[in-house]
C-alpha cells in the first residue's frame, strides 16, 4: 500500500526559495514560482507575504536605482515619511568612522530637502573600548550639531545587525509614530541593495504578524564609499536570519551551505 507523501512545512519551503534565488538568481525564477505554489498549499498567508518579498528581491536585484548623495525629487513631503539611516561600526574609542559620517551627510541633505520627514538613526554599541556609546546616539548628536531639529529624530540604539535594525525600527515606528507609512533608506552605496531587501522583508512579516498596515520603502540615498559590492549571497543569509535560522545563515555567509540543484 502506497503511503501519502507528507507535506513539507512552510519554513522548509521558504528556505528553499531563498537558497535557490540566492544561488542562481534569475535562472531560478521558475523554481521559485513552483515553490510559491507549494507554499500556497501549505500556508496561504505566508505564501502571500513571501510572494511580495521574493518579487521585491528580484526587482531590487535586477532594476534597483541608487540615488547618490541625496534623496530624489517627488517623495512625500509630509511627516508620514521617515528617513532611516543605517549605522556603521564605531572606532574602538566610540568615535564615528568617516564612512558613517558620510552617511550622515547624505541623511542631513535629504532631511533638509524633506523638512517634514522624521530621521531614524539605527545601531547599537559597537565600540570595543567604550561601552557607553552607541552608533545611533553618536549619529543623532552629529545631526543635532549640524542643525537638525532634535524633535525630528528617532533613535534605535539596541541593534547589532541590519536584520535587527529593521526589526527594532519597525517596532518603534508602530508603537510611537503610527502615522509614518513610508521610509527611505540611507546607507553606503554597496549596502543599499541588501539593506533595502532586509528592511522590506522585516516590514512585510512584522505587519502580517501584528495584523497591521505595511510600511513601504519608497526610495534610497547612498553615500559613495567606493568599496566593492557585498556578495549577493549575503542577502540570502540575511533573509534566513529573519526566518530565525541563524545556523543556516552562517553557513551561507561562509559559503559552506549545500547548494540546491536547479
Residue map of PLM features:
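Extended hydrophobic blocks
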Residues: 1-82, 89, 167-262
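Short loop/turn segments at strand-loop or loop-helix junctions that form parts
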Residues: 83-89, 121-124
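Surface-exposed cleft-lining segments at the edges of enzyme active sites
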Residues: 89-96, 128-129, 152-155
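Histidine-anchored nucleotide/phosphate-binding helix
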Residues: 97-116, 169
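Short, solvent-exposed amphipathic alpha-helices that sit
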Residues: 102-110, 131-143, 194-205
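Early exported N-terminus immediately downstream of N-terminal targeting peptides
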Residues: 112, 116-127
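A non-catalytic structural micro-motif
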Residues: 118-120, 140-158, 204-222
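Short phosphate-binding loop-to-helix
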Residues: 157-170
